[in-house]
Each structure stands twice: as structure tokens, then as C-alpha cells.
Amino acid sequence: MKKNTLIVIAGLFFLMAWTTASAERYVPDQHPTGIVNWGNGKAYFFSGGQYIRYDIASDKADPGYPKNINAETWPGVIWMDGIDAVVNWGNGKAYFFKGGQYIRYDIKADKADPGYPK
């Protein structure tokens, strides 16, 4: 049986390919709404109110995932039901988008910057 290949481009300069069979093991409902390369060997896949942390070098999800988006896992990201998109801007900041709003996230501090969403 021939396997389909899914190619995902997200974040800055991030390209990943895998068979759909392997993608099903990692992405909560197989329809990610946000995918971002965090720049530290990890990528995050968001789907609905959940996300997984993916280890690029080992080509697999980290143990214990998926997890829910909440105040403990993503401080300051208020959209517990999910996001529309996310991008690592390459300057230590990531941007989460939902509807017409966005949140700037400080990657090093691991929390949203004050004054968001905008």
C-alpha cells in the first residue's frame, strides 16, 4: 500500500515531511492549526485546545503529550480552545493568532508579554 506524504511549512524556515501514518501518532486530531519551530530542537503542533512538543532530532513527540493549552503550559495565552496560527519571529518572540487578535510570547521567559492580546 502506498503511503501519502504530508509536508508542513511553518514558523521560520521550518520544513518537515512524514507519512500520514506517522503523523497520526503525533497530532491530536490530524488537523494542526498551528505549527512552530521553537528554535531549540523542538517544534510545537497545536490542534484544538491541545498541543504536542516534538523533538526534531529524534523525530518523535516528547513523552507525556498531548497536553492542554492552559495558564500553566502557555502562560498568558488565553485561548484554551485553540489558536489559528503561531509563528516564531526569530527575535526571541513568537506570535499566537486567534481571530483578529494576537499575543506576543517571550520564548526565553516562557510567557506572554504584558498588554496582550491586541
Spans of features found by a protein language model:
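Disulfide-stabilized extracellular ectodomains of secreted/luminal proteins, especially beta-rich
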Residues: A23-K118
